């Protein structure tokens, strides 16, 4: 009978220990979820900035090419008119 009581006490202690471990794991999991969410938001902002930079560079390239083409055409026309 005494052995059964000791076993029950031991089981209750193990149960408390398991509950504490589970609680710790749940808190850790919650922190990880928050960190993942923060990283996801940061990646989204980086993606938005990258898109803006790509558009700016593309616009600059198109402007440069347009200037070169128009300048070349004007030079050709000027030389034709001059001669």
Curated annotation (Swiss-Prot):
**Where would you say this protein principally sits, based on its record?**
host cell
Coiled coil regions in record = 1-45
Annotated GO biological processes are: killing of cells of another organism
This protein's membrane topology, according to the annotation, is: Single-pass membrane protein
Which keywords does the record carry? Coiled coil, Cytolysis, Host cell inner membrane, Host cell lysis by virus, Host cell membrane, Host membrane, Membrane, Transmembrane, Transmembrane helix, Viral release from host cell
Question: What Pfam families does the annotation carry?
Answer: XhlA
**What would be one Gene Ontology cellular-component term for the protein?**
host cell plasma membrane
Q: Cellular location of this protein?
A: Host cell inner membrane
Q: Where are the transmembrane segments?
A: 57-77
Residues of the signal peptide:
none
According to the lineage, what is the superkingdom?
Viruses
Function text:
Probably functions as a holin together with holin-like protein 26. Accumulates harmlessly in the cytoplasmic membrane until it reaches a critical concentration that triggers the formation of micron-scale pores (holes) causing host cell membrane disruption and endolysin escape into the periplasmic space. Determines the precise timing of host cell lysis.
- Name assigned to this protein: Holin-like protein 24.1
Q: Which organism is it from?
A: Bacillus phage SPP1 (Bacteriophage SPP1)
